[in-house]
Amino acid sequence: LNKPLLNDNEYDQLKEDILFLEKKYDFLASENSPSKIVGFKPSKTFKKVFHRVPMLSLSNAFDEEDLVNFEKKINNFLDQKSSNEYEYSAEPKIDGISASLVFKKGKFIMGLSRGDGKEGEDITQNLMTIDDIPKKITAKNFPDEIDIRGEIFIQNKDFENLKDKFANPRNAASGSLRQKNPQDTKKIPLKFIAYTFGYVNKMEVKNQSDYLQQLSEWGFKTNPFNKTIKGIKNL
């Protein structure tokens, strides 16, 4: 039934504890540490394909102090003493499965799972069944080559009919994308929201907010609650 022993919050907190200990006692770090693993090993059921640009995961922030420290890192990177005028593109995190959609000449030709971040599973045929994913884009400003990245998920209201098979919507989305028969995947009400990109040969956008707007114009669904916010404390 794909039932995890820990919920996401418990897992994230344990991972944070491990990262803290490794930072303090570096000799504790091992190759199997969560700090060195992104996602999961690709399944043997599907063909493995390397991402043209690594598909990394996001770090967690558990409280306001974590956010302030994040902004301090930005200041240090930019060699700034202090500032609360940075603009942040923010949107709620969708609890689903990350996917990378490869487009060439406007045509969706391949879809990959995150896998371990470097190498993903070729789940193209299953992704083809999702209505939210455009299969052909004719916009003149659409790049010749681009990897559109986003989240595959199941809405809570649609999960009601799947409770007997899966522990939660995220596991349902994951299991559905790993079906051997795409017709079985098609029966599941999967959704897709785009939010970033991997490889792109050429694209003219100034910032993340502009990119999200461009995605909408190309026909991709984006998070309706995304906002541009000034200052980390206004998040």
Residue locations for each model-derived region?
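RNA/tRNA-interacting regions in translation and RNA-turnover enzymes
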Residues: 1-235
